[in-house]
Curated annotation (Swiss-Prot):
Forms a heterodimer with mus312/SLX4. Its EC number is 3.1.-.-. SUPFAM superfamilies: GIY-YIG endonuclease. It is found in: Nucleus. This is Structure-specific endonuclease subunit SLX1 homolog. It comes from Drosophila ananassae. Its cofactor is a divalent metal cation. The gene is slx1. One of its GO terms (cellular component) is Slx1-Slx4 complex. A zinc finger (SLX1-type) spans 197-250.
Length: 299
């Protein structure tokens, strides 16, 4: 049996700022540390935009923003979180499927996920569901990070994950600034764009909307977004959005999500968007949404 090795990128004892407020979407797994044997070891799957705040809400109870299903059944530990979703809708769909594998169309092909095995812990059962989810579409084409928050629970994945997914360790912290550390510097580096697409050799009209380049700052790749997408898809018929591939000029390994992020930084964030983010606290800094689904499994 082969397991994928862990890739630790953070000191587990320290917080790591990985996203700015309003741009983090995570689906987490809680495990109860209750002294009551009825609840100890039970698990809960939820969605959050701020993991540190969310675990505090769960442990304080539903009167303080926690979920009704976790009240008085803790204390809880947030042991792992999956993040890197492009938006909250995709993350909430992932959350629902993880909660309800027997109802998910994507997971019905795995009859072994219908119930927990007799001697299997609740954590191991939920981890087994997650392992299968990450290997099937549409989730297997997302640039996701599987982040361990508690080292005592870390283990390998029995079913190998897609190569573009990362397994990392370390706590999560959300930055309140409009940009992550280093983003301002990246956005101010001058780019020597070519007037034509390197792939179709046609002029690029409306470059702010349709132009993409390499993430390697020394590479002069200039392409239409559609041309580069088709190039990276290569021999993947039936797909419209690539996962990644090699730069056609410098052969740097590219991630499609990183290309789009770089494009956003180079174009800048419109002032009206910044104003909306600062004004709409209910969207970016309000209570998290939890699906009203019970996942505290019984033996």
């Amino acid at each position: 049996m082969s397991f994928r090795k862990f890739t630790a990128t953070a000191d587990p004892e320290k917080d790591e700022t990985i996203a700015r407020k309003g741009h983090f979407y995570g689906v987490y797994l809680l495990c109860s540390q209750s002294l009551d044997s009825r609840y100890r070891g039970k698990c809960y799957v939820g969605f959050t935009v701020n993991p540190k705040r969310r675990i505090k809400q769960h442990n304080r109870g539903c009167d303080f923003g926690g979920a009704k299903k976790t009240s008085r059944k803790g204390p809880w530990q947030m042991v792992m979180i999956v993040h890197g979703f492009p938006n909250n809708i995709v993350a909430l769909q992932f959350e629902w499927a993880w909660q309800q594998p027997t109802l998910s169309t994507r997971l019905k092909i795995f009859p072994e996920l219908k119930r927990k095995n007799p001697r299997e812990s609740h954590f191991d059962y939920n981890f087994r569901i997650l392992n299968r989810m990450l290997g099937v579409g549409p989730w297997n084409r997302l640039a996701l990070k599987i982040r361990w928050l508690e080292t005592d629970y870390e283990r390998g994945f029995e079913v190998p994950l897609p190569r573009h997914m990362e397994i990392v360790s370390g706590k999560v912290s959300i930055s309140s600034s409009q940009r992550r550390k280093g983003e301002d510097a990246a956005a101010t580096v001058p780019v020597a764009w070519a007037p034509e697409c390197h792939l179709c050799m046609q002029r690029i009209d409306q470059p702010e909307r349709s132009r993409l380049g390499c993430t390697n700052p020394t590479c002069r790749l200039t392409c239409h977004m559609l041309c580069l997408a088709n190039y990276l898809l290569g021999d993947e018929p039936g797909h419209y959005i690539p996962v990644g591939g090699e730069c056609p000029l410098c052969e740097t390994r590219l991630s499609w999500s990183a290309l789009l992020q770089r494009k956003r930084l180079l174009n800048g964030i419109p002032e009206e968007l910044l104003d909306q983010e600062e004004a709409d606290e209910d969207l970016s800094d309000g209570p998290d949404v939890d699906s009203d689904v019970e996942v505290l499994e019984s033996d």
